[in-house]
Amino acid sequence: MNKQYQSRRWCWVYAIVCLLLFFPLPTQCAEPITPVLQVQSGKLTGLVLDPGSGLSVFRGIPYAAPPVGDLRWRPPRTPTTWEGVRACNQFSAIPWQRRTGTSKKSEDCLYLNVWTTAAGKEARLPVMVWIHGGGLNKGWGHIGKYDGSAFARQGVVLVSINYRLGPLGYLAHPALSAESDQGVSGNYGFLDQIASLEWVRKNIAAFGGDPDNVTIFGESAGGTSVAVLSVSPRARGLFHRAILQSPWMFGFTSSLAEPNTVALKRSTGSFSGAEELGSRWANKFVAGEGAAALTQLRKMSAQELVDAGSYDARVTVDGWLLPGRPVELFAQGKQADVPMMIGTTRNEGNYFIRYVGSKSRTEFEEKLNRFYGHAGGDVARLYPGDSAQELTGAGCLFCTDSWFLQPSRRMLQGMRHVKSAAYQYMFARPSKSYPKLGAPHAVELAYVFDTLNEKTASAQDRQLAQTMNRCWAQFARTGNPNAAGLPTWPAYTMEQRQYLVLDHEITQGARLRDKVCDVLDRASQDVYNKPPAGK
């Protein structure tokens, strides 16, 4: 019996040891919890990522009430309060969008995330609010490469946000305008962004941030968003610096109700305003345009709305949130008087290589003539080539220049009307994953956030990422990206037009494709400022 008892005892000991080895107790592996912070909606905690530096992250903080049910297609409302302590240790669901994958999607998506090393302290650190890209139709704020840890280690409080996308974020419709106190519709995603900035102003001090030193920055449609916020009277005073990375400003804007210019016909085949476009989309699955149709639309599930018909989200000039096209408002000096960084990548258009080719030289020139009218020939001469390969290259270069570089230059030149300085960059480091594409659209993101794969990135790439992350943080800190140990970055002026070339060897340049941009300036003025003949 004694031997049998001892045998059983050792079996139990062995089993317990195995359990501890393979299934450690939660307290042994869980990340430490931050101190309890108080925000306007209640108390919350986050996770401590690095106890030594105090680096912490707060995930999934609601900055507005869920825009569901009757709140669909309405301006965001104040977030509801909660009892007890909210554990902000999980990212929220991503906004509804047409994409495959396992990421949980929800209409209840108005959440933000905060990275900081000063939670609960009166540190008054500079704040940076990241607005993701994705054509206003896809994306979310907590993609891995947007991790804010590197910025936090630079002494910045980094905030990333989600906002409504696609038809849920940008649908303009006569019935929606009729029920609005301002008589407008569309742009709900931009209103979400403004609500997030209002939340930051009221609450970021609890995370060690300075509500009087807020930088907004974004890439692609996020850069477009920064441009919109920079000229919107609704966002004035909510930020103090702005960074526009590859802002997509080409043919991306429509008026609310009035017939639009050739820019809209290019993508829609009509001169209709945003409301009419929204009505056509809604009429695919709901009859009528009045309040009854709106009731039916609000009863549809988010998935039905996103999947039932393709809605091309766009910026709507509504006269309330957005009084005009951002590029033209910059040119008139009507933007916020805050320091700005504006830049592009060397080969933006190569990202869109599948969409910009032409079967023949004639077809390529016809496309330009349809958009630019009598100026199409001048534009076509900028992009020679006859073979399929040459025409693809011409299309990619045209995309780089007209979609990104020329509008960016217009905004940079518009900064001469205000007191604040502007800085231009051009990211030139080729993509390691797709070297044949050069430095395409969005390639700079992992460098800005310093989130390159440490196992595969070269020492030179890691150094470039660290330098860019420091430049961005320094700009957020002071409004000037120059500091000891950083490359000399001259401000953009109409006389010199200098910019920084971001590559393994960081250099300065001047007058980036100025002659090409001059031609595109003249051509685009004809497009955007004159309605088509007979309309």
Language-model segment annotations:
Residues 50, 354, 406-535:
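Mobile gating loops/cap/lid regions near enzyme active sites that modulate substrate access
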Residues 13-24:
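Bacterial N-terminal signal peptides
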